Amino acid sequence: MKIVLASASSRRRQLLSRLIENFQVVVSDFDEDSVVFQGRCESYVMKLAEGKAKDVCRKLTNESSIVIGCDTAVFLRGKVMGKPRDIQEAFHMLKALSGNEHDVYSGIAIMDKVLHKTVKSFVRTTVKFSEIDDRCIKNYLKKGEYKDKAGAYGIQGYGGVFVKEIHGCYYNVVGLPLNKLYNMLSGMGVNL
């Protein structure tokens, strides 16, 4: 049985390699804008993860494989913060997160192409930022680390200096909650 990661994220690839030695990466072309946030964080990220996994399943014709889709988003005061479109949006995101608690949700969808079975779940982690002044935000943005990251920061990089507290799974904030993924794959009979 082949394991396939439906993601372009180098962070997810790196994390998955801690659980599984050999897997294939197939980038999903799923249109993330087709999923509209309707107030339920867990539902939103699971729909995105499932969309990515389904898209990759369609690309894999006649192959026995298990496809892993994942999506991570930041939520502040009931609003979703995805990946910033530009440096200005990144600045506003970090300014909003400054001194506040926010939730990071990851949705996971695992599809078994042979059994035509899908398992979905999510993980929530609460993160509290220190107060960050404009100068610090601008210096951080110059590093370019904010690109392609929900909420415009990477906890595993320099963005981690903004984090005052974390409650929940650290790997969820990085982009792939390993404990949840391990339990889901084990529950599907995948030997890890």
UniProtKB/Swiss-Prot annotation:
It comes from Clostridium kluyveri (strain ATCC 8527 / DSM 555 / NBRC 12016 / NCIMB 10680 / K1). The record marks R11, T72, Q156 as: Important for substrate specificity. The active site is at D71 (proton acceptor). It catalyses: dTTP + H2O = dTMP + diphosphate + H(+); UTP + H2O = UMP + diphosphate + H(+). Keywords: Cytoplasm, Hydrolase, Nucleotide metabolism. This is dTTP/UTP pyrophosphatase. Gene3D superfamilies: 3.90.950.10. InterPro entries: ITPase-like_fam, Maf-like. The lineage of its organism: Bacteria, Bacillati, Bacillota, Clostridia, Eubacteriales. Its cofactor is a divalent metal cation. It is an enzyme of class 3 (hydrolase).
